Curated annotation (Swiss-Prot):
Alphabetized UniProt keyword annotations: Acetylation, Apoptosis, Coiled coil, Isopeptide bond, Methylation, Nucleus, Phosphoprotein, Repressor, RNA-binding, Transcription, Transcription regulation, Ubl conjugation
Organism classification: Eukaryota, Metazoa, Chordata, Craniata, Vertebrata
GO BP: apoptotic process; regulation of mRNA processing; regulation of transcription by RNA polymerase II
Protein name, UniProt field: SAFB-like transcription modulator
Domain SAP positions: 22-56
Organism, as annotated: Homo sapiens (Human)
Comp. bias (Low complexity): 371-384, 1022-1034
Residue stretches of biased makeup (Polar residues): 342-351, 879-890, 995-1016
Length: 1034
């Protein structure tokens, strides 16, 4: 106790008093002052200032100014957010050497006190003493220029110290198998669990901030510095607290590095076991970590500022690493997990806090028992921790602190939940200042309601799962310590082997194997060869299991790599290692001596045998290493071949895809070409069809035009024929049957009776003898070509006017309506007998008769304008002519009908064959069917003009003078289109019977009608043979 008091005085003497305004103080300083006065430190800055002013006024001081002691022991505050830590560290970074010296003195006193407490901790205290010396040297070195290098060396030295501490702990565990060791092992197991939470938790709490060895080293150095700074920060609280904090902080250092060493030496099988036990333990395991958190929270609340000051002063590089990690942390997650790198809140936060809780539990045990052993301290520590279950999810640590603060002083309060199952129940860990307060809180608060939830409050002491884990961790730590003892002796050989790291992970695995082999071999030294071989097989199994674990969990892989990298870093040789090397060599020498004594006791082996055994072990190790390298090489070769095959396969697949793509493109081009050709064919086909349709339409149009033209020509012919027929004289063929026909003809030859159509002057019977029907005055205006020898033009001069007037008058009633149309008895199909034999003689007779008539004077007939008009009333009207009596004419008509009853049918059929309109053709049938006897004058030239200049004289057949005149009954011909031909006048009915020659021989009694285009050749308006008399001769 005296030593502790001296330490407090020394640390207080090292502080510097400084007067400041309260308003200028930082929140952390305000909380520190409030905590010194045992006041509430919750609230914002204004609340804290008002509370502090009130306290100072009560003390009688100046409420505006305060005397602030800036030293290592000043801050006794609750941990603040990361930003506050950064600012605080920056401000305190200037006083590194002064406070470091004070801290070293404190640590020396505390180490001496701790050494008095436990006789078995001598070696540990000496190590801590050396560590403090190293820290002193380190703090001076960090002020020099080579900060990074010394940071690495510091971390290496710390790793070695940790191994030595583990050895000492294992010795303690072997020596004492009491509850103290169990508790330490339990703490160790908890640390391992925390490391597992960080390294292998499913929610990725192991961040990438520590893959690099340098970063990890900085974090480790930072963590170690924090742990060492914890020792001197509780001076204002109590001296006993200071002592216990020093020891427990160092224990925490040892325990924290135990997990790393487990990973380094390949014995992470223990981690797997504890990890496997964690899910089974369930909520108990969760309960342990909150307990640890609460303990650690308490310690950090008391001593955080001292830690930060020395850390910042110690190493700017460490400060940067710590600050970056502080930014990642949220709220009041503690700094001692910075060696694990910045991690997200959640499971990593629990892991961080759990390591602090383990230290805090030790602190509280030392508080209760003072200078008693850590055995009694461990049992006492659990009495200060309260486990609160059944909290609602919105409960905060401040709520717990306020609630439990009613029944005592609350050192720390934590609210924890199971990060692996979000949404699970919340639990609370509250650390009270004494066990009496714990029992008071339990008595008052158990089964009460908080935030609508019923909470249960109980001590953390009797946790069954904790005991199980203590046992497991006890076993693990004992086996680990024995392995680590041996591992230190062969450390140099391992580092040499690790220099050949071709691929980092493979070489590290082989180094793990080497370390296991080393442990096994040195185990042989202690025991016998059988034991060694058993240990070897056990270590091989462990290494395989470790490989499995590392391959399954990427978090474990990261930690294995980085810990091995830190552990086996061959290039680290610095002052710190040299400083520490002497103490390590001494320890190794003492251990070797102990082993030699044990060997001598068991079996005194000659030196040669020992050398052979060592050589064998080395050979075995090298053989294993060679096998491992060979296996790795084979794996690499296999992997290379697999990659090559995969590459070739990918290349082939790509080539095949490209080939298929090219083929598809080619086929697509072909398809497009075929499509274009098909479309071109379709287009040509459509064009062809269109052209054919156009041709067909054109042909149809031409045919329609031709038909129209033909119809128009036919209509024109019909019109002309009708016009000409209206101009023609009335046909009086029936007068051929008149008894006076032959007698009067010659008498009236010179008259104009054939133009008069029944004029008053008398007509001779033979007036047709010299008359050519083709030259008849049908066209008196233009008859230019005439074959008669006398001047016929003179005869037409007086009559032309009257004849011109006829057609207009006669057109009043169409000619085809004038006569009944009889189509019933068509007899045109009978070919008439040929009449060629009569032609020559008839021609002579006609010429002779014409000559006889040349001197006949043609009289005018002014009184007759339309001689045929009276006939329109009936089919056979009486004629107005006076040269023959009406009675004789009608008598002749009747006789003619009797003699030739079939003529009208023939005539109709003959006309219809010629294609004229049937009405026109049959219009003359009212004359007793005598139309067939009428000759039709037609143009031989085939033209449609029916005027004399186009007419040619048709050779008249000579008429038979000896035959009766009445039998010559060829009707006067008309133009080719005038099928409704009219009978000529009485005087020329017989003489006008001329026939027209066609290309073929026409029947005797018909005049062939040759129309221009429409009349078929050889189908003239044929004359039908007489039935009642001899054939008619022309």
């Amino acid at each position: 106790m005296a030593a502790a008091t001296g330490a407090v005085a020394a640390s207080a003497a090292s502080g510097q008093a400084e007067g400041k305004k309260i308003t200028d103080l930082r929140v952390i300083d305000l909380k520190s002052e409030l905590k010194r006065r045992n006041l509430d430190i919750t609230g914002v800055k204004t609340v804290l200032i008002s509370r502090l002013k009130q306290a100072i006024e009560e003390e009688g001081g100046d409420p505006d100014n305060i005397e602030l002691t800036v030293s290592t022991d000043t801050p006794n505050k609750k941990p603040t957010k990361g930003k506050g830590k950064k600012h605080e560290a920056d401000e305190l970074s200037g006083d590194a050497s002064v406070e470091d010296d004070a801290f070293i003195k404190d640590c020396e006193l505390e180490n001496q006190e701790a050494h008095e407490q436990d006789g078995n901790d001598e070696l540990k205290d000496s190590e801590e003493f050396g560590e403090n010396e190293e820290e002193n040297v380190h703090s001076k070195e960090l002020l020099s220029a080579e900060e990074n290098k010394r940071a690495h060396e510091l971390i290496e030295a710390e790793g070695i110290e940790d191994i030595e501490k583990e050895d000492i702990e294992s010795q303690e565990i072997e020596a004492q198998e009491g509850e103290d060791d169990t508790f330490l092992t339990a703490q160790d197991g908890e640390e391992e669990e925390n490391e597992k939470d960080i390294a292998g938790s499913g929610d990725g709490t192991q961040e990438v901030s520590k893959p690099l060895p340098s970063e990890g080293s900085l974090a480790e150095a930072d963590h170690t510095a924090h742990e060492e700074m914890e020792a001197h920060t509780t001076v204002k609280e109590a001296e006993d607290d200071n002592i216990s904090v020093t020891i427990q902080a160092e224990d925490a250092i040892t325990l924290d590095f135990d997990g790393d060493d487990l990973l380094e030496t390949g014995k992470n099988v223990k981690i797997t076991d504890s990890e496997a036990s964690k899910p089974k333990d369930g909520q108990d395991a969760i309960a342990q970590s909150p307990e640890k958190e609460s303990k650690d929270y308490e310690m950090n609340a008391n001593h955080k500022d001292g830690k930060k000051e020395d850390c910042v002063k110690g190493d700017p590089v460490e400060k940067e690493a710590r600050e970056s990690s502080k930014k990642a942390e949220s709220g009041d997650k503690e700094k001692d997990t910075l060696k694990k790198g910045p991690s997200s809140t959640g499971a990593s936060g629990q892991a961080k806090s759990s390591s602090k809780e383990s230290k805090d539990s030790k602190t509280s045990s030392k508080d209760d028992k003072g200078s008693t052993s850590s055995t009694s301290g461990s049992s006492g520590s659990s009495t200060k921790n309260i486990w609160v279950s059944g909290l609602s999810s919105n409960t905060k640590a401040a709520d717990l602190k306020n609630l439990f603060g009613k029944y005592g002083k609350v050192l720390s309060a934590k609210v924890v939940t199971n990060a692996r199952s979000p949404g699970a129940k919340c639990y609370g860990i509250v650390t009270m200042s004494s066990s009496t307060e714990v029992s008071r809180c339990i008595a008052h608060l158990h089964r009460t309601e908080l935030h609508g939830q019923l909470i249960s409050v109980e001590k953390v002491k009797g946790d069954p799962s904790k005991k199980e884990m203590k046992k497991e961790n006890d076993e693990k730590s004992s086996s680990r310590s024995s392995g680590d003892k041996k591992n230190t002796s062969d450390r140099s050989s391992k580092t040499q082997a690790s220099v050949k790291k071709e691929e980092k992970r493979s070489s590290e695995k082989s180094e793990k194997k080497e370390s296991k082999d080393t442990k096994k071999i040195e185990g042989k030294d202690e025991k016998n060869d059988n034991g060694a071989s058993g240990q070897t097989s056990e270590s091989i199994k462990k290494s395989e299991e470790k490989k499995r674990i590392s391959s399954k969990s990427p978090g474990h892989m990261v930690i294995l790599d980085q810990t091995k990298g830190d552990h086996c870093r061959p290039s680290r040789r610095g002052r710190y290692e040299k400083i520490h090397g002497r103490s390590k060599e001494k320890e190794r020498a003492s251990l070797d001596k102990k082993r030699d004594k044990d060997y001598r006791r068991k079996e005194i082996l000659p030196f040669e045998k020992m050398k052979e055994q060592r050589l064998r072990e080395h050979l075995v190790r090298f053989e294993r290493l060679r096998r491992a390298m060979e296996l790795r090489r084979r794996r690499e070769i296999a992997e290379r071949e697999r990659r090559e095959r995969e590459r070739i396969r990918i290349i082939r697949e790509r080539e095949e895809r490209e080939r298929l793509q090219r083929e598809r493109e080619r086929l697509e081009i072909e398809r497009q070409k075929l499509e274009r050709e098909r479309m071109e064919r379709e287009r040509l086909e459509r064009e062809r069809i269109r052209i054919e349709q156009e041709r067909r339409k054109e042909a149809e149009r031409i045919a329609r035009e031709r038909e129209e033209l033909r119809r128009q020509q036919q209509q024109l012919r019909y019109e002309q024929e009708k016009r000409n027929s209206l101009k023609r004289p009335r046909d009086v063929d029936h007068r051929r049957d008149d008894p006076y026909w032959s007698e009067n003809k010659k008498l009236s030859l010179d008259t104009d009776a054939r133009f008069g159509h029944g004029s008053d002057y008398s007509r001779q019977q033979n007036r047709f003898n010299d008359f050519d029907h083709r030259e008849r005055g049908r066209f008196p205006e233009s008859s230019a070509v005439q074959s008669s020898s006398f001047e016929r033009r003179d005869r037409f001069v007086g009559q032309s006017e009257g004849k011109k007037a006829r057609p207009t008058a006669r057109r009043e009633d169409p000619s085809f309506e004038r006569y009944p149309k009889n189509f019933s008895d068509s007899r045109r199909n009978e070919p008439p007998p040929p009449r060629n034999e009569l032609r020559e003689s008839d021609r002579r007779e006609v010429r002779g008769e014409r000559d006889e008539r040349r001197t006949v004077i043609i009289h005018d007939r002014p009184d007759i304008t339309h001689p045929r008009h009276p006939r329109e009333a009936g089919p056979n009207p009486s004629r107005p002519t006076s040269w023959k009596s009406e009675g004789s004419m009608s008598t002749d008509k009747r006789e003619t009908r009797v003699e030739r009853p079939e003529r009208s049918g023939r005539e109709v059929s003959g006309h219809s064959v010629r294609g004229a309109p049937p009405g026109n053709r049959s219009s003359a049938s009212g004359y007793g069917s005598r139309e067939g006897d009428r000759g039709v004058i037609t143009d031989r030239g085939g033209g449609s003009q029916h005027y004399p200049e186009e007419r040619h004289v048709v050779e008249r057949h000579g008429r038979d003078t000896s035959g009766p005149r009445k039998e010559w009954h060829g009707p006067p011909s008309q133009g080719p289109s005038y099928h409704d031909t009219r009978r000529m006048g009485d005087g020329r009915a017989g003489a006008g019977m001329i026939t027209q020659h066609s290309s073929n021989a026409s029947p005797i009694n018909r005049i062939v009608q040759i129309s221009g285009n429409s009349m078929p050749r050889g189908s003239g308006s044929g004359f039908k043979p007489f039935k009642g008399g001899p054939p008619r001769r022309f």
